[in-house]
Amino acid sequence: MAACRLCCLCPCLRPLGCGPLGRPGRNRALSYLQMRALWSSTGSRAVTVDLGHRKLEISSGKLARFADGCAVIQSGDTAVMVTAVSKTKASPSQFMPLVVDYRQKAAAAGRIPTNYLRREIGSSDREVLTSRVIDRSIRPLFPAGYFYDTQVLCNLLAVDGINEPDILAVNGASVALSLSDIPWNGPVGAVRIGMIDGECVVNPTRREMSSSTLNLVVAGAPKSQIVMLEASAENILQQDFCHAIKVGVKYTQQIIQGIQQLVKEIGVAKRTPQKIFTPSAEIVKYTKIIAMEKLYAVFTDYEHDKVSRDEAVNKIRLDTEEHLKEKFPEVDQFEIIESFNIVAKEVFRSIILNEYKRCDGRDLTSLRNISCEVDMFKTLHGSALFQRGQTQVLCTVTFDSLESSIKSDQIITAINGVKDKNFMLHYEFPPYATNETGKVTGVNRRELGHGALAEKALCPVIPKDFPFTIRVTSEVLESNGSSSMASACGGSLALMDAGVPISSAVAGVAVGLVTKTNPEKGEIEDYRLLTDILGIEDYNGDMDFKIAGTNKGITALQADIKLPGVPIKIIMEAIQQASVAKKEILQIMNKTISKPRASRKENGPVVETVKVPLSKRAKFVGPGGYHLKKLQAETGVTISQVDEETFSIFAPTPTAMHEARDFITEICRDDQEQQLEFGAVYTATITEIRDTGVMVKLYPNMTAVLLHNSQLDQRKIKHPTALGLEVGQEIQVKYFGRDPADGRMRLSRKVLQSPATTALKTLNDRSSIVMGEPVSQSSNSNP
């Protein structure tokens, strides 16, 4: 049976091979499904790509056959299924409506979700970040003007805890799109490169990654071109980084060849879209006549800032659109808008390519004016304001106890290997940063991605044994390009202001790219690299290449490329140009603060450890943790147990620590403890009667201890009342020291009933030791 593509539940079902249904477009849909069913009946197709000591298995044709494209990528026992579907009706949006969702299923790790509903809810940070990597790898290869809703879903089928699934998902998206009829100029291949003992490792295992100084993801296109880069590193040298990129590109070509082989075997025909949303040459030509000179005047007026330039361009836009509507009354509104965008972009880029000048008057390698300020607010643990041109970022540092670190549940640990972390950076981009209005609730994907990049930049310089959880917040107050790298700079300043002993200061910069392409060959003929790009240069350019690091090396990198591929040569030049700019920025930052404060601020938190002997642990904790809860409620401290006798105390202020110290001294004070002598007999007072025994005290300020039923009498009893014992009654007990396992006091009344000479001691007079005859205690009388 076959159904139309719009709905597999359509009631109009016909056996394959039957006559037409008499509906427009039905014959085409039926033949499409017939072809797909015939292909799938032959079984799935698969290829294996050898990546040195790793193998990548690519298969299709067995699962999700109604989707436009589907692929299963497997490495070891980790498998990811990726589907790609695109509508045949154009979207009303004026951009490429691509949605990528990567989902990690608990079942893939053999687990059940731990939330209340016991099912997957929402997307984790890791899922969002992986989705962004996939999106940035495949988006540049869609044809210009293809405005059709397209969805790529990545479903984790199985994870073995050895091979990482995110790289498989990127390759799976490439295969699914390549095998579909969706217009896409792929394929791409992706690998992860690690560096262990100076050697590059392709697609390292989770254990290998734990000892790697580099985590580099490379997405490559045919002809050894680069589509996407993302990396975090332990401050590795520039030459090592460049070598790792070249190794990654080499192995991406092997994956691309495997995908191309599979596509050739299956024989894929791409669909012809109903319409590609690009304006006609006639409209573009007329737009140039109207607006080109005006735009040139605006883009070469170096007195403009972001606001005034945008206002001038918008004024030209409105005037141009009015003329175009009069000249072409029947043309779609989108074509009019897009024609102006094309002309504005062309003028902007030609000034850079031909005159080596930028719209703010800088040359290609100059930085914007930079100013730094630290210790903005005295009550904060650390703060800094970083201003670069019209991009302004306020960063703060907050310390808390290690109990406040980000905890990973069993499922996340099983799938990603992510453990607790005590350093985090949260990035906020409020609407007012660009003079707009909008919602400020929640964190969107862009904020999450920018914050993760800045966190990667700073994480390698944070000491591993720092006794606090560190939270850096970065709030963008003004934005005109490269706010994520400004966050890395501001975060570094704030950490030093807070007294965090970072190994080195960190700075970041964004490098842009403007190219001139041969229309016949599709190759780059000429290009310009721009240091420290503006927002308008990012919008009209071909690449946003962000790099961060110290004076010594690189800690983070991210390349967002709009072209279907960039040669390695350009990437290498961008890294070199960014490294020079990074050192210039560090010199400016060092003028404000060059090293961390020698000590944290006076109002900062304090961490101390206290030793509590096993004998006093019960008193320190209290019944049901009463003393600890009271201590934390009254002083605001956080207490965590390090080992059997050691407790770590975090206090938000030195005053709180002083109060906590006095509280602990008071509850643990026991000035008569040392008088107890092993084997001596003491008079104890019953304070409570329980089913299991009686609670007794040997002296007034002592914590009551349990005298078990088995130690009350030679006879076996089930309840203390059988012996006539009452609260307030005094009995004689023999002291046998403390249990070495839990520190509890060991007392016995039973042994005193045996005929033996005993020494009766009193705690009221230290010198009094009464030697007596064998003690005989009545079960129903006071001793």
From Swiss-Prot:
KH domain mapped to chain residues: 605-664
Pfam families noted in UniProt: KH_1, PNPase, RNase_PH, RNase_PH_C, S1
Residues found modified as N6-acetyllysine: K250, K264, K285
Residue(s) carrying N6-succinyllysine: K552
Keyword Oxidoreductase belongs to the record: no
Major place of residence: cytoplasm
Transit peptide limits: 1-45
Gene3D superfamilies for this protein: GHMP Kinase, N-terminal domain (3.30.230.70), K Homology domain, type 1 (3.30.1370.10), Nucleic acid-binding proteins (2.40.50.140), Polyribonucleotide nucleotidyltransferase, RNA-binding domain (1.10.10.400)
CC annotations in GO: cytosol; endoplasmic reticulum membrane; mitochondrial degradosome; mitochondrial intermembrane space; mitochondrial matrix; mitochondrion; ribosome
Family affiliation: Belongs to the polyribonucleotide nucleotidyltransferase family.
S1 motif domain ranges (all copies): 679-750
Disruption phenotype: Mice show alteration in the mechanisms of polycistronic mtRNAs processing in mitochondria, resulting in fewer mature mtRNAs and a reduction in electron transport chain (ETC) components formation.
UniProt topology in membrane: Peripheral membrane protein
Organism per entry: Mus musculus (Mouse)
Protein name per its UniProtKB record: Polyribonucleotide nucleotidyltransferase 1, mitochondrial
